[in-house]
Amino acid sequence: MLFFRKRAEMPAPDQILPGRPTPLPTAERHFVNGRALKGPYPEGIETALFGLGCFWGAERKFWQLGDGIWVTAVGYAAGTTPNPTYEEVCTGLTGHNEVVLVAYDPAVLPFGQLLRTFWESHDPTQGMRQGNDVGTQYRSGLYVSDPERRAEAEASRDAYAQALRAKGFGSITTEIRDPGPFYFAEAYHQQYLAKNPAGYCGLGGTGVACPVGTGVRSAAE
C-alpha cells in the first residue's frame, strides 16, 4: 500500500477533494472465477460492502469462502468525493473507506457467515486503523442497504462486542450504515493477492471467535 500522511480524522467539508464525473476504468472480469465484476448479477444474488483494513487481504477472505460467493470486488465507499482514485483516497481527503463488495447467494451462503468472516478477520476496536495501516480509509465498516440485513449486522456487532470485552478488548468502533455510492477501484487492485500471492497483507484478527449467538455456524459444525 502507498504511504501518505496518515489522517486519523474525517475531512471537513471544505477539505473534500472534487473528484470527477466519470468512473475510473477497472477490470471487466473477476481474476479468480471469471465472472463479470460489475454484473448484472443473477436473480437472488445480494450484495454487501465490508471495510476491514487494506482491501487486498480483505477481498481474499471473502472469495475464499467459495460456494455461495458469486463475485467479489474492491472499491471505495462511505465517502464524499465522486469517482476517487486510490491516491486520492489515501490522502484521507475523500472520506472513503477501502471496502470489499461481496455479491453472494444467501440461499447457499447465509449472511451470518459473511458477518462471521468480517468480525474474525480484523480487529474492529482500532478506530481509524488496522494494525500498521493507519488512516480513515482503513476504518472498520459494514455497509448494507436492506433494513433486515442491517439489523442482523447490528445484532452481530453487539454479540461480538460482549465476546471481545470478555477477552479484555475495548469497544467496537465499526460503523454500520447505508453504503451510499460504491466506486470500483482501479483494475490492478482487483483480486490483487490472486495475481500477487506474495503481496502485502496486513490483515489480522483478534483471535476471538464470533459467538454462536450471532446465528452463525462454525466450519466444524
UniProtKB/Swiss-Prot annotation:
InterPro entries: Met_Sox_Rdtase_MsrA_dom (IPR002569), Met_Sox_Rdtase_MsrA_sf (IPR036509), MsrA_MetSO_reductase (IPR050162). The keyword Transport does not apply. SUPFAM superfamilies: Peptide methionine sulfoxide reductase (SSF55068). One of its GO terms (molecular function) is peptide-methionine (S)-S-oxide reductase activity. It holds the Pfam family PMSR. GO terms for cellular component: cytoplasm. One of its GO terms (biological process) is cellular response to oxidative stress. Has an important function as a repair enzyme for proteins that have been inactivated by oxidation. Catalyzes the reversible oxidation-reduction of methionine sulfoxide in proteins to methionine. This is Peptide methionine sulfoxide reductase MsrA. It comes from Methylobacterium sp. (strain 4-46). The lineage of its organism: Bacteria, Pseudomonadati, Pseudomonadota, Alphaproteobacteria, Hyphomicrobiales. The gene is msrA.
